A protein has these predicted regions:
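Active-site pocket-lining/capping segments in soluble small-molecule metabolic enzymes
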Residues: 1-315
């Protein structure tokens, strides 16, 4: 109360000033909260996958537009995916602290000639290397590369990228203010809680370089999957790298299954299902239900999903 008379109403002053300068823009932004964008009945579904057994299913599954796979799985399934009419993309490392192994880029060039559509890019180092090779137009930016606002989106568009991924931190209201026409949105997956250079496997049992999966339990007995990336470039003939890392994932998967109609109203160009530790059976069931939901059909199963930041956003 003592300080109240010294406070100025910054919000009102700022709104008044902006409204005087750009009335049309303010009106358009205000309207975004009330007028939904055109809802597409059919939206392309892409998938990313980290496991051998699940990737076999995905390459032959109907309703999937394209697949993102790491090096070892592209090596095995590129031709199968192409034969089944899928767009095939190479998933690059989440963290890059060294050059690709010998022979990596030479093989990638051969795959491009064979029909590889492009790359899922997770960091600026990978993007820079591809851009220098004249491959910026084949880059799909993952959610880890900054595209929170329209200015950032315009920057990347000027670089000539293929598309970007909607940030995981924005809520539904914020996404309605974002230009999503060239964006892909993740609607299923285990969200990463932490990328760590401190290997859980090494610190607990010692390093074996076998890219194992572990589980951390909290005091509530919730289980958090941990994936060891001993060979970030995923070339089978390479040794475990010093630049290895772990990703710790959430205990529950994130899923916007019942929200399919609301996602379509955001105007995104495609949606993505991100598979990490799922079994073959889980993968098949989840794909069928999400493809049905986003293509306007009935869903067959019930799931327990977290909604991530879709409802409340990040502060």
């Amino acid at each position: 109360k003592l300080l109240q008379k010294y406070r100025r109403n910054v919000g009102d002053e700022r709104v008044k000033r902006i409204a005087e300068e750009t009335p049309a823009k303010i009106s358009a932004i205000a309207a975004c909260d009330h007028v939904p964008r055109k809802k597409e009945e059919y939206i392309p579904v892409y998938v990313s996958c980290e496991s051998e057994e699940a990737s076999e299913v995905l390459c032959q599954k109907d309703g999937i537009q394209g697949i993102y796979l790491p090096y070892a799985l592209i090596e095995k399934h590129l031709q199968t995916g192409l034969d089944n009419g899928k767009e095939m993309y190479l998933s690059l490392p989440h963290i890059t602290r060294e050059n690709p192994p010998e022979g990596y880029m030479e093989q990638v060039k051969k795959w491009l000639e064979a029909g590889l559509s492009g790359f899922l890019v997770r960091n600026l180092e990978s993007y820079s290397a591809l851009a220098q090779m004249g491959l910026a137009d084949k880059c799909v930016l993952d959610h880890s590369l900054y595209t929170w606002n329209d200015e950032a989106i315009r920057f990347w568009k000027d670089q000539g990228i293929l598309r970007n991924t909607v940030p995981l931190e924005l809520n539904e209201k914020e996404l309605r203010h974002r230009e999503n026409a060239g964006s892909e949105m993740i609607v299923y997956g285990r969200l990463p809680l932490m990328h760590s250079a401190q290997c859980v496997r090494k610190n607990t049992f010692g390093c074996n370089g076998q890219e194992e999966r572990l589980v951390l339990k909290d005091r509530y007995d919730k289980e958090f999957p941990v994936v060891c990336y001993c060979r970030p470039w995923k070339m089978g003939n390479t040794k475990a790298a010093e630049s290895c890392y772990n990703i710790i994932y959430n205990s529950l998967p994130y899923g916007l299954l019942k929200e399919a109609d609301r996602v379509k109203e955001l105007g995104v160009s495609s949606v993505r299902l991100a598979f990490t530790i799922e079994s073959r059976e889980e993968t098949e069931r989840i794909v069928e239900d999400f493809v049905a939901a986003y293509h306007g059909s009935q869903v067959s199963h019930e799931y327990e999903f977290t909604k991530g930041h879709f409802k409340r956003g990040a502060e």
